Amino acid sequence: MNAKKQSRIRRATRSRSKIRELRETRLCVNRTPRHIYAQIISPESDKVLASASTLDKDLRSGATGNIDAATAVGKLIAERAKAAGVTKVAFDRSGFKFHGRVKALADAARESGLEF
C-alpha cells in the first residue's frame, strides 16, 4: 500500500475513534475516481440506517464522478436520513480532504436539513 493511502487510512481511523467516543450517528463518505457513496451509520451497532450513491437508480442517469453528482448524493442522503428519523450526525470524511466532491456532498446535506 502506498504512503498516501496509508496516511488517509490512518486519518480515517483516528477520526472514527473520536466519533465513536461521541456516541453519535455518523454520515460516512467514501469516494472513488468514478463514484461517491454516503451512509448514515448507527452508533450502537454499526448498522446502516440510510445510504445513497451515484449508483442509485435515481442518480444513475447523470454524471457520476463530479461535484454535481456529489451534490445530488448529499441531497438524497439527507432526505433518506430524515425519513429514517435522523436529523443530527457526525461527519466522517474517511480521511479524505474536506474539498471538492466531499465538501459538495456535505454542503448539500446541510442545506437539505442535516445538522453536523
Curated annotation (Swiss-Prot):
Pfam families per UniProt: Ribosomal_L18p
Provide the Gene Ontology terms for cellular component.
cytosolic large ribosomal subunit
Q: Which InterPro entries match?
A: Ribosomal_uL18_bac-type, Ribosomal_uL18_bac/euk
| Keywords for the protein's UniProt record, in alphabetical order | Ribonucleoprotein, Ribosomal protein, RNA-binding, rRNA-binding
Q: Establish whether keyword rRNA-binding is in the entry.
A: yes
Entry coiled-coil feature ranges: none
- Single GO MF descriptor: structural constituent of ribosome
GO biological process, any: translation
Q: Which domain of life is it from?
A: Bacteria
Q: Quaternary form?
A: Part of the 50S ribosomal subunit; part of the 5S rRNA/L5/L18/L25 subcomplex. Contacts the 5S and 23S rRNAs.
Family statement: Belongs to the universal ribosomal protein uL18 family.
Q: What does this protein do?
A: This is one of the proteins that bind and probably mediate the attachment of the 5S RNA into the large ribosomal subunit, where it forms part of the central protuberance.
NCBIfam families reported for this sequence:
L18_bact
Q: What is this protein called?
A: Large ribosomal subunit protein uL18
Organism annotation? Teredinibacter turnerae (strain ATCC 39867 / T7901)
| Gene encoding the protein | rplR
